[in-house]
Amino acid sequence: MPGKRILVVEDDFMNMRLTQHILKSEGYTVLKATTALEAIEQIKATPPDLILMDVRLPDMSGMTAVRILRENASTRDTAILALTACAMKGDRERILQMGCDGYIAKPINIRDFITTLRKFLDPGRQKQ
């Protein structure tokens, strides 16, 4: 599925750089945002095929941004995966209940990361 556009919403420079490197090496087009508001505006201008949303962002919670995107008809069905260090018991379930389609824990396991992306970029995808 190379050529698909993936928006990475991440405020940490090193995490953004690593994620971007992995995605580009797999042939994906990477769009970047460092805040939730920047992401929302960018999505309006250039809708991505998939969004990787950090949960903790400087301007608002990534989950608040997910709620805003889910309320908008043009982004309601866009795949959104939480990309987060929140790995306590119950975090995954809470994040999925808040509107994310999937969950990827940091630090990233590259093989699992790519497998998960491919699963959600498949047109016949199912929620995790």
Can you name each region flagged by the protein language model?
Residues 32-50, 67:
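Acidic, metal-coordinating helix/loop segments flanking the phosphotransfer/catalytic sites
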Residues 108-117:
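C-terminal output helix
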Residues 10:
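Conserved acidic carboxylate
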Residues 16, 58-61, 76, 88, ...:
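The feature encodes the CheY-like receiver
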Residues 41, 63-76:
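Short amphipathic alpha-helix used as the core "switch/output" element in two-component signaling
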Residues 54, 84:
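Active-site residues of response regulator receiver
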Residues 17-25:
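Charged docking surfaces used in two-component/phosphorelay signaling
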Residues 14, 35, 61-67:
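Acidic catalytic/metal-coordinating carboxylates
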